[in-house]
């Protein structure tokens, strides 16, 4: 007990392995390492989303929807990292932190370019999470269950939502009123639906219900109407 008391509040010397916590039991070191690597990736993703928020929040951009979405996306990624770190600590593990690199791209030509980077980033997160799940599946049933129930559905939902947005932007284009209308719709969606990390999928009914009627043509096609503006 005295030995343990002396270790409270003290970090292990550089290059030395941390002392195992009393709660640690059958927590595979390979799974622990994979968890920590994914935590770093989530924090980098949060940093990336935060840089997008800063870009679109400038007065020369004033993209309300994008700023709200990017701020929320940054928050969600940071919260996922926190939940995973808390899980590692609950299992008696140790989170070894390292530097987070600055985002390679800090400016975007248009919304389509920005969402392309968002989708690519989210796919990297999903690939890492799937690799982590496969690592844990054969080594630690509790870890794999945590990933499947607490993480996987959330990331897949985010990927689907961002991909749907990108597909709509392909149709709308980057000229005219289209991007402005999309940004205003995005602002409403973020405020009305993104109240928890489980992001709902984007549907045509959602899109149409948040756009003024005058932006639809006679046949009810919003994309075609926007191109005429």
Swiss-Prot record:
One of its GO terms (molecular function) is ferric iron binding. The keyword Metal-binding applies. Keywords: Acetylation, Iron, Iron storage, Metal-binding, RNA-binding. This is Artemin. The keyword Transmembrane does not apply. Belongs to the ferritin family. It holds the Pfam family Ferritin. It comes from Artemia salina (Brine shrimp). One of its GO terms (biological process) is intracellular iron ion homeostasis. Artemin is elongation factor-associated and self-associating. The modification N-acetylalanine is found at residue 1. GO terms for cellular component: cytoplasm. Residues 25-173 form the Ferritin-like diiron domain.
